[in-house]
């Protein structure tokens, strides 16, 4: 009896377990049918190999729906029991279309902040800033150290998800990016080429000759070769004792490549090279400041943080690069001695006299601060030296920004998604014997290497860390990243909210905050003070009067018409003339067309870029100068130009107000308010026709006291 009873109980128990297994299988099938493919466990963290599971855990697998298992009673076999299928990972409800998995509206082209690592961490701590260093090239070592010091997260091989910051080694176009921040401006490489820089500075020299006398007089070859010969001969005829020296620099050259000195224009190497490789010839600075009887220059690092509004920072320290032969004024016998005349590091490192030193104040490469200390010990006014250098940097950037704006709107048109930009520039400055700073050139990609090559044996080299380079360059990169930190403002806003009364209750309702961050935790507490000093807009009041070409660029961009183009067509130029009411009985529209054709044809023949037809910005500036000189004949050029800009801006503001009224209706008070007409400068400057007289507050603009920039 017991045995039969136990067998029947066992069979009943097996049957009950089989029924339970069938029910579990049916439930699993229902869940699998509702969600055809199980949700992926984690979003792919990208090519950098971000871990998707905690250490020691097994990666969950995506399982296909399991077929329902029949019960033992249905099969007629109570002896063979099949186990229920393994349990699927717990599934999350599908997000509503247009919303992210957390119920937030989706941003077009952007992932959910939490799922992509853009929200707060699971433990309530702020997520680290992410940096894509896959295109960093020679600056990679210094960048890695900077990221490590900041405790940010580096992606050395890129990432599928967007990063906060992209670090490019060459240009803006190293990567195709549509969000975040990138350390290059579009067009910067083209703008600091020697010919383009010389033209930009020359435009400013025409307007403000005394303010821009820090750049040597330059001629562009081959276009201005005959002009160069004629002007040199004219000066020699007036002063037979004048024995100049000139330096020839290839337009696209770098690291001293192709540079040579001449005493006479006939010494220029014309044989085929200038046509394929244009160049700039400049007056050579024959009386530089010497230290230890050696010529040297200064590499200063300048951060262009923003283009509009303009923000400029200068590093408090830089590098001083020395020649390796004692300096002598140039003569026909020593013109070829490059180690005496050229300060380029890439040239002098091959000299047998080059001295590598870990000390900041000795060797062939030293810190600029050590040079200032040495000058200060001799009684030199260091504040005056710094003030003059800051002035050179600001004025140079003001000369570059107009055309940079045109490049920027071409690559990142207004209203379209795109990254924001910043860039570290290398300014090469020479101090003359009287301590006046002279701008030699600007580098879009200054070397950020922190090691040098050491020759172990003939032809065998190894890379050795350079403590001087590391001291200066790591600080520049690290503090640039600190200034560009995209989460800094968010942290500050959160701290301010938590300091308010009852802020805790409001934060509890905020879905973005999983827990309150520690207000007292300063992520930069362990870092030294920032080595970058803001100089603009800090000193904007002293330099804004120079930004005339910048205002012309705004007019130029307004009438471009097609987004993404960089040249103004004939229709756009006519529209500019009509909108600003510049045509008159003495300047017909036919004359305007001829002006456009003549200037555009000449500038297109001088530039190598023939991708687009039309009027470039420099051609527009020349046409604008011509119109200003016709309209305001009794004023200096900079006042003529300022008056015409004021007139154009006045008429365009009226046009904008008229469009606003047509779109929204006239306010109940009657006529819409607008700026009054500009004040009349003098009867001779009265515009023709019914045009209101322009404002000419240039006297006030130019009467700025010359403060020391500390």
Curated annotation (Swiss-Prot):
Please state the Enzyme Commission number of this protein: 6.3.2.-
Binding-site positions, ATP: 249, 255-256, 282-285, 295-297, 343-344
Query: Which residue positions does the secretion signal occupy?
Result: none
The entry's keywords:
ATP-binding, Cell projection, Cilium, Cytoplasm, Cytoskeleton, Ligase, Magnesium, Metal-binding, Microtubule, Nucleotide-binding
Q: Which PROSITE patterns match?
A: TTL
Molecular function as annotated in GO:
ATP binding; metal ion binding; protein-glutamic acid ligase activity, elongating; protein-glutamic acid ligase activity, initiating; tubulin binding; tubulin-glutamic acid ligase activity
Q: Pro residues bias located where?
A: 83-93
| Region annotation c-MTBD region: where it falls in the sequence | 467-538
Q: Which cofactors are named for this entry?
A: Mg(2+)
Binding-site residues, L-glutamate: 321, 345-346, 365, 473
Composition skew (Low complexity), residue ranges: 64-82
What's the protein called, per UniProt? Tubulin polyglutamylase TTLL11
- Source organism: Homo sapiens (Human)
Encoding gene, per UniProt annotation: TTLL11
């Amino acid at each position: 009896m017991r045995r039969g009873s136990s067998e029947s109980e066992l069979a009943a128990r097996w049957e009950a377990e089989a029924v339970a297994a069938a029910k579990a299988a049916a439930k699993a099938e229902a869940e699998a049918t509702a969600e055809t493919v199980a949700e992926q466990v984690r979003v792919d963290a990208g090519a950098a190999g971000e871990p998707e599971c905690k250490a020691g855990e097994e990666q969950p697998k995506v399982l296909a729906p399991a077929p329902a298992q029949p019960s033992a009673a249905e099969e007629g076999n109570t002896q063979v029991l099949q186990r229920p299928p393994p349990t699927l990972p717990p599934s999350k409800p599908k997000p509503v279309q247009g919303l992210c998995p957390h119920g937030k509206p989706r941003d077009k082209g952007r992932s959910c902040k939490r799922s992509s690592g853009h929200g707060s961490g699971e433990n309530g701590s702020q997520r680290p800033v992410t940096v894509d260093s896959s295109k960093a090239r020679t600056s990679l070592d210094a960048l890695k150290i900077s990221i490590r010091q900041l405790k940010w997260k580096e992606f050395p091989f890129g990432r599928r998800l967007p990063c906060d910051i992209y670090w490019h080694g060459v240009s803006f176009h190293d990567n195709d990016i549509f969000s975040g921040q990138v350390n290059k401006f579009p067009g910067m490489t083209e703008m600091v080429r020697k010919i383009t820089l010389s033209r930009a500075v020359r435009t400013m020299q025409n307007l403000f000759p005394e303010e821009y006398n820090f750049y040597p007089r330059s001629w562009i070859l081959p276009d201005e070769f005959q002009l160069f010969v004629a002007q040199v001969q004219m000066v020699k005829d007036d002063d037979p004792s004048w024995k100049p020296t000139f330096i020839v620099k290839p337009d696209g050259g770098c690291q001293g490549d192709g540079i040579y000195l001449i005493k006479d224009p006939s010494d220029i190497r014309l044989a085929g090279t200038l046509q394929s490789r244009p160049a700039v010839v400049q007056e050579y600075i024959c009386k530089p400041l010497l230290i230890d009887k050696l010529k040297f220059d200064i590499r200063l690092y300048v951060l262009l943080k923003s283009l509009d509004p303009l923000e400029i920072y200068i590093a408090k320290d830089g590098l001083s690069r020395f020649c390796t032969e004692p300096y002598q004024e140039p003569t026909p016998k020593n013109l070829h001695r490059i180690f005496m005349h050229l300060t380029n590091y890439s040239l002098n490192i091959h000299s047998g006299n080059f001295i590598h030193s870990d000390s900041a104040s000795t060797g062939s490469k030293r810190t600029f601060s050590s040079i200032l200390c040495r000058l200060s010990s001799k009684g030199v006014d260091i504040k005056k030296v710094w003030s003059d250098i800051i002035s050179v940097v600001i004025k140079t950037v003001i000369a570059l920004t107009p055309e940079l704006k045109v490049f920027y709107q071409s690559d990142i048109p207004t209203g379209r998604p795109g990254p924001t930009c910043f860039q570290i520039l290398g300014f090469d400055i020479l101090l003359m014997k009287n301590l006046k700073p002279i701008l030699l050139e600007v580098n879009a990609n200054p070397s950020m290497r922190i090691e040098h090559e050491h020759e172990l044996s003939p032809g065998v080299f190894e890379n050795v860390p350079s403590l001087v380079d590391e001291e200066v360059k790591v600080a520049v990169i690290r503090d640039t990243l600190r200034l560009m930190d995209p989460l800094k403002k968010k942290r500050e806003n959160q701290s301010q909210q938590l300091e308010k009364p009852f802020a805790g209750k409001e934060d509890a309702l905020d879905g973005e905050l999983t827990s309150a961050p520690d207000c007292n935790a300063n992520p930069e507490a362990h870092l030294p003070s920032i080595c970058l000093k803001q100089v603009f807009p800090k000193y904007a009041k002293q330099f804004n009067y120079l930004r005339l070409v910048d205002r012309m660029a705004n007019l130029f961009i307004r009438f471009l018409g097609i987004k993404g183009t960089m040249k103004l067509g004939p229709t756009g130029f006519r529209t500019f003339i009509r909108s600003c009411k510049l045509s008159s009985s003495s300047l017909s529209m036919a004359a305007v067309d001829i002006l456009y054709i003549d200037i555009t044809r000449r500038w297109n023949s001088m530039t190598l870029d023939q991708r687009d037809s039309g009027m470039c910005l420099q051609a527009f500036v020349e046409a604008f100068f011509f119109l200003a000189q016709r309209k305001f004949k009794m004023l200096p050029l900079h006042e003529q130009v300022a008056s015409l800009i004021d007139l154009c801006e006045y008429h365009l503001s009226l046009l904008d107000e008229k469009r606003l009224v047509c779109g929204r209706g006239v306010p109940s008070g009657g006529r819409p308010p607008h700026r009054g007409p500009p004040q009349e400068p003098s009867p001779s400057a009265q515009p023709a026709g019914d045009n209101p007289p322009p404002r000419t507050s240039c006297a006030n603009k130019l009467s700025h006291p010359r403060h020391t920039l500390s």
